[in-house]
């Protein structure tokens, strides 16, 4: 009768001195792992987005959340005139980043996605360049 009580107390004391798993979120920020797939961002090269508008990212996206429209500059080089990602549809799989031939898209470690309006979840080109 006393042995189960002692075994239970042993387990309780062992767990009492372990490092806590829970973080007090607004005060303590978790650090995501290096492989964490967070919010998307466009990379910049020579003060322009690196995207050459090859349409591989919207083609490979299983959620169909990426919209790209091409434009041409004076040297007839293609660039993304319109680049949008609907974060409400995105499943954060990372296929768009893997498919990009010029490494123009990356996934950041940012994970806070709270907003009040649905329109704020559609990330346009300018917002993707800020990250």
From Swiss-Prot:
It comes from Geobacter metallireducens (strain ATCC 53774 / DSM 7210 / GS-15). Pfam families: Fer4. The gene is nuoI2. Keywords: 4Fe-4S, Cell inner membrane, Cell membrane, Iron, Iron-sulfur, Membrane, Metal-binding, NAD, Quinone, Repeat, Translocase, Ubiquinone. Its main location: membrane. This is NADH-quinone oxidoreductase subunit I 2. [4Fe-4S] cluster 2 binds at residues 61, 90, 93, 96. [4Fe-4S] cluster 1 binds at residues 51, 54, 57, 100. NDH-1 is composed of 14 different subunits. Subunits NuoA, H, J, K, L, M, N constitute the membrane sector of the complex. Residues 42-71, 81-110 form the 4Fe-4S ferredoxin-type domain. It catalyses: a quinone + NADH + 5 H(+)(in) = a quinol + NAD(+) + 4 H(+)(out). It comes from the Bacteria. One of its GO terms (molecular function) is NADH:ubiquinone reductase (non-electrogenic) activity. NCBIfam families: NuoI, PRK05888.1-4. Binds 2 [4Fe-4S] clusters per subunit. It is found in: Cell inner membrane. PANTHER family: NADH DEHYDROGENASE UBIQUINONE IRON-SULFUR PROTEIN 8, MITOCHONDRIAL, NADH-QUINONE OXIDOREDUCTASE SUBUNIT I 2. Its EC number is 7.1.1.-. It is a peripheral membrane protein. Belongs to the complex I 23 kDa subunit family. NDH-1 shuttles electrons from NADH, via FMN and iron-sulfur (Fe-S) centers, to quinones in the respiratory chain. The immediate electron acceptor for the enzyme in this species is believed to be ubiquinone. Couples the redox reaction to proton translocation (for every two electrons transferred, four hydrogen ions are translocated across the cytoplasmic membrane), and thus conserves the redox energy in a proton gradient. Its cofactor is [4Fe-4S] cluster. GO terms for cellular component: plasma membrane.
